[in-house]
């Protein structure tokens, strides 16, 4: 059996119900590890009753000499009260015993504050004055152990303390034994396993619905005409008339004006008389024939010139019409090439953005895989039985390795 200064072999938990009954539960066994939650030492004062904490009546204590136990009991007696102490010891090797009954006598107050207890048993009686210190009383696990195998056949001593006082109690009140103070530290290592992801190929597909309808209608209307002008051919002047106008200024403020007109006749009257009117008619016919010949030749030349001008005008018009069609085709080709260029730019931008996002994802995953994360946890709970402190720290460290293998390049003929 464990001694006072050695590690306890079992750790127990005490639950107290509304009626004050205690229920002892076994938490675990000490297997020799350095666990502060299970390997705690008894820190009770040396002047207390062996095997029991302050303010709690022990029901099982270790075997001690009778005079030493009596000396420790006499140290707790009050000088102002007269008490009768009766002590009886019983040696037994059996683990069965009768639980003592507790009664409280004294003033009504908080639990465990200056109270007096009366314990009675069917086997032995004694008296002592025991006063609890505060609400931080601790019950020894060895004193509450009801496992008969823990005695190992050793001699035990049972002491029942009966306290009598002149103060009359107004009611029954029981001291609730609480679990001894424990400091527990939990160390938990969580291993996160990440399975290798299958290689995946992301194909960005953009659904495109294209409606194309081409209908070209070309209509050409042309008209070429020439406005003819009248050709005036003047007759040749052989001898024009002579007109003279002269003004003469004379002295004395007088002036004189002279008008003279001279008509020239090429043929003399004698010659006219000699040629006769028939000759004159022949002359006039020849002159008219020459005029008609000249007019016909001029008209023919004008028609040829007009035809050449009209042909050139038609050629210029047709050239301009072809230029119109070429302009339309050029504009259509310019629009198509501009749209194709913008599509290629958008495709390149999308590819670059996807690569950038993939790189960001790889960097973020690598940073998280190789990073160390820690969290400090501090819990403080104030309750009726005291203040509970719980502190912890969670640290996560991960490391990952990624390998990439590239196969031979393959070319597909489209």
UniProtKB/Swiss-Prot annotation:
<keyword id="KW-0346">Stress response</keyword>
<feature type="coiled-coil region">
    <location>
        <begin position="341"/>
        <end position="376"/>
    </location>
</feature>
<keyword id="KW-0175">Coiled coil</keyword>
<keyword id="KW-0677">Repeat</keyword>
<feature type="region of interest" description="CAHS motif 1">
    <location>
        <begin position="305"/>
        <end position="323"/>
    </location>
</feature>
<dbReference type="GO" id="GO:0005737">
    <property type="term" value="C:cytoplasm"/>
</dbReference>
<protein>
    <recommendedName>
        <fullName>Cytosolic-abundant heat soluble protein 89226</fullName>
    </recommendedName>
</protein>
<feature type="compositionally biased region" description="Polar residues">
    <location>
        <begin position="388"/>
        <end position="405"/>
    </location>
</feature>
<comment type="function">
    <text>CAHS proteins are cytosolic heat soluble proteins that seem to contribute to the anhydrobiosis in tardigrades, but their specific mechanisms are yet to be identified. It is possible that protection during anhydrobiosis might occur via the stabilization of vitrifying small molecules such as sugars, but not via the direct glass transition of CAHS proteins themselves.</text>
</comment>
<feature type="compositionally biased region" description="Basic and acidic residues">
    <location>
        <begin position="69"/>
        <end position="84"/>
    </location>
</feature>
<comment type="similarity">
    <text>Belongs to the Cytosolic-abundant heat soluble protein (CAHS) family.</text>
</comment>
<feature type="region of interest" description="CAHS motif 2">
    <location>
        <begin position="342"/>
        <end position="360"/>
    </location>
</feature>
<feature type="compositionally biased region" description="Basic and acidic residues">
    <location>
        <begin position="27"/>
        <end position="45"/>
    </location>
</feature>
<keyword id="KW-0963">Cytoplasm</keyword>
<feature type="region of interest" description="Disordered">
    <location>
        <begin position="27"/>
        <end position="155"/>
    </location>
</feature>
<feature type="compositionally biased region" description="Low complexity">
    <location>
        <begin position="86"/>
        <end position="101"/>
    </location>
</feature>
<feature type="compositionally biased region" description="Low complexity">
    <location>
        <begin position="120"/>
        <end position="134"/>
    </location>
</feature>
<feature type="compositionally biased region" description="Polar residues">
    <location>
        <begin position="142"/>
        <end position="155"/>
    </location>
</feature>
<feature type="region of interest" description="Disordered">
    <location>
        <begin position="388"/>
        <end position="414"/>
    </location>
</feature>
